[in-house]
């Protein structure tokens, strides 16, 4: 309808302009030179075209095949990566070994009337190994690995995305046995709604049709990966399409150790390096983070002309990954340096007294956008946190600002990220965990007419934690000063140095 309207408007525009020229020539300038009248007519047509150039391009017929060939960027290859290259995901690998057995010993499953799953969906945070697992499965089954990104199928022209989906599955059937891997599948598989986006809906519909259209004995498996499973259309998740839905989470300590072994097996390590210690210090880090850390440590060793990678390089690499690049010549004012020292001292002291985490290092060496940081890690991997533990985390986060207020009788902008994280935890306590005076219930802010009651509860939690932080710091002000002065002197304090300083201050108090 829209295109027809554009055609009518363009035709009328040209007709009116030509009519105007005709009247001008016949009535106003009847003796006008014929060549000049021709030039005027041509000029009007050219100007009209230039004014409506974009509309003309939209009205031109689209060659879907050419678009598919030029824009589609799928990889189509055999891979040498196997499960030996995957670490820390033993449970997932065991699940995938069933798929391998299915593909290599089809007959015994056919006798039992069992069908191989058509699709597997990996979901979880970025960097946890979803792409690596898909590639390894292709390597283990000697299948052709065909990968694509969900965004490759999202286009302006209606029908292009669907055309690419058809081409992808046609390629897979031609190359069978094959594995189709669609990364960020949420870009193409988002829930359908009332919005008028026919291209997006057609693309998703075509994907659904293709997944229904091939038989499990054709040797094709579709693997999708996403970190937003909540956004996927229900039709995509139903059995018969994605039969297996597997969560790939951040690795625990044992898994991190296995991942570190894989990423250091071809690297010369010094005797000072303890992979177990590194696994303990890297709580919350994904496989991608660990790979980046190991690579960074190797680069640092080369830059220092060392023959082996030592503990020092790994510690520096860990800080780079977590806190950012160290600034060699920071233009930090002395006043800002003092504020940063007392700010970090406040965090560290409350963290130690409330036993929030193990304090590994305190530093006022600027990294990234931060003037200082406290490197701290949990003593063990925990799946559950109590209300007290969450409030202690908030109190530690607010310790930096509380320390500034006590020492300088003033607060700075340095607590921005601390406040964001503290508010996030308090929000989760109120809305997700039922840990407020509102009782054992959850809240969806999108469904509430007013968020005032939730905001009040968040304020109560943060204010009570801030009062506790100030109380602890006032009672241990001498220790805050001692830690800050040591930071101003040395710029960084290790775990061992903090313990020594703590004991000295305790002795002085006695």
UniProtKB/Swiss-Prot annotation:
Its cofactor is Zn(2+). It is a multi-pass membrane protein. Its EC number is 3.4.24.-. Residues 1-4, 53-510 are cytoplasmic. It is found in: Cell membrane. One of its GO terms (biological process) is protein catabolic process. Binds 1 zinc ion per subunit. Zn(2+) binds at residues 343, 347, 418. Acts as a processive, ATP-dependent zinc metallopeptidase for both cytoplasmic and membrane proteins. Plays a role in the quality control of integral membrane proteins. This is ATP-dependent zinc metalloprotease FtsH 2. It comes from Thermoanaerobacter sp. (strain X514). The lineage of its organism: Bacteria, Bacillati, Bacillota, Clostridia, Thermoanaerobacterales.
């Amino acid at each position: 309808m829209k295109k027809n309207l554009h055609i009518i408007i363009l035709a009328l525009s040209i007709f009116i302009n030509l009519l105007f020229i005709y009247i001008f020539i016949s009535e106003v300038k009847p003796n006008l030179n014929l060549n000049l009248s021709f030039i005027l007519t041509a000029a009007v047509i050219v100007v009209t075209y230039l004014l409506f150039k974009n509309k003309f391009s939209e009205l031109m017929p689209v060659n879907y095949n050419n678009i598919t060939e030029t824009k589609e960027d799928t990889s189509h290859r055999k891979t040498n990566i196997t499960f030996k290259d995957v670490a820390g995901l033993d449970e997932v690998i065991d699940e995938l070994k069933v798929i391998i057995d299915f593909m290599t010993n089809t007959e015994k499953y056919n006798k039992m009337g069992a069908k191989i799953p058509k699709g597997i969906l990996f979901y979880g945070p970025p960097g946890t190994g979803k792409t690596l697992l898909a590639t390894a499965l292709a390597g283990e089954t000697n299948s052709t690995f065909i990968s694509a990104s969900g965004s490759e199928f999202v286009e302006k022209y209606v029908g292009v995305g669907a055309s690419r989906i058809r081409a992808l599955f046609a390629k897979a059937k031609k190359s069978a046995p094959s594995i189709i891997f669609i990364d960020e599948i949420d870009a193409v598989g988002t829930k359908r709604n009332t919005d008028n986006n026919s291209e997006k809906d057609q693309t998703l519909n075509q994907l659904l049709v293709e997944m229904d259209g091939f038989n499990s004995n054709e040797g094709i498996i579709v693997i999708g990966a996403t970190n937003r499973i909540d956004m996927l259309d229900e039709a995509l998740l139903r059995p018969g399409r994605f039969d297996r839905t597997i969560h790939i989470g951040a690795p625990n300590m044992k898994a991190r150790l296995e991942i570190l072994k894989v990423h250091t097996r071809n690297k010369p390590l010094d005797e000072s390096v303890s992979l177990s210690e590194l696994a303990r210090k890297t709580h919350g880090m994904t496989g991608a983070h660990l790979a980046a850390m190991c690579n960074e440590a190797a680069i640092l060793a080369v830059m220092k002309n060392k023959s082996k990678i030592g503990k020092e390089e790994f510690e520096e690499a860990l800080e780079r990954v977590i806190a950012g690049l160290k600034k060699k010549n920071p233009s930090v004012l002395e006043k800002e340096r003092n504020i940063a020292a007392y700010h970090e001292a406040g965090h560290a002291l409350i963290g130690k007294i409330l036993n929030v985490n193990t304090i590994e290092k305190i530093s006022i060496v600027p990294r990234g956008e931060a003037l200082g940081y406290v490197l701290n890690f949990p003593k063990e991997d925990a799946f559950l946190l109590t209300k007290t533990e969450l409030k202690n985390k908030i109190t530690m986060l607010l310790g930096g600002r509380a320390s500034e207020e006590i020492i300088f009788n003033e607060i700075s902008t340095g607590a921005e990220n601390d406040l964001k994280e503290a508010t996030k935890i308090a929000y989760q306590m109120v809305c997700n965990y039922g840990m407020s005076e509102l009782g054992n219930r959850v809240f969806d802010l999108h469904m509430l007419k007013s968020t005032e009651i939730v905001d009040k509860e968040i304020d109560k939690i943060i204010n009570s934690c801030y009062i506790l932080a100030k109380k602890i710091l006032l009672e241990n002000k001498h220790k805050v000063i001692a830690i800050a002065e040591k930071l101003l002197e040395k710029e960084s304090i290790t775990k061992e140095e903090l313990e020594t300083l703590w004991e000295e201050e305790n002795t002085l108090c006695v």
